[in-house]
Swiss-Prot record:
Keywords: Ribonucleoprotein, Ribosomal protein, RNA-binding, rRNA-binding
Subunit structure: Part of the 50S ribosomal subunit. Contacts protein L29.
Record Pfam families: Ribosomal_L23 (PF00276)
GO MF terms held by the record: rRNA binding; structural constituent of ribosome
Organism the protein comes from: Methanosarcina mazei (strain ATCC BAA-159 / DSM 3647 / Goe1 / Go1 / JCM 11833 / OCM 88) (Methanosarcina frisia)
Protein name (database record): Large ribosomal subunit protein uL23
Length: 82
């Protein structure tokens, strides 16, 4: 089972694409290692860094930075964000 629930799409999240970063809502029980493994397996791009936070609504959000240039744009295009 994947720890990735769905992409987090806001205006601020779209501006992070220029920094080669994407945001996802993830399972609250997942850790950073599981999130990195799932994203790399699903989308085929290496993750450079991951930051997680719990929102006020009780969901867990992960901000992922990618090693390859333009990886975030490619993934966003694949999942239909652009």
């Amino acid at each position: 089972m994947s720890s990735i629930n769905y992409p987090f799409v806001t205006e601020k999240a779209m501006m992070l694409l220029d920094e080669n970063k994407l945001q996802f809502i993830v399972d609250t029980r997942s850790n950073k290692k599981q999130i990195v493994e799932d994203v790399e397996k699903l989308y085929g791009f290496k993750v450079k860094a991951v930051r997680t936070m719990t929102t006020m609504k009780g969901t867990k959000k992960a901000v992922l930075a990618f090693e390859e240039p333009e990886a975030a744009h490619e993934i966003a295009t694949r999942i239909g964000l652009m």
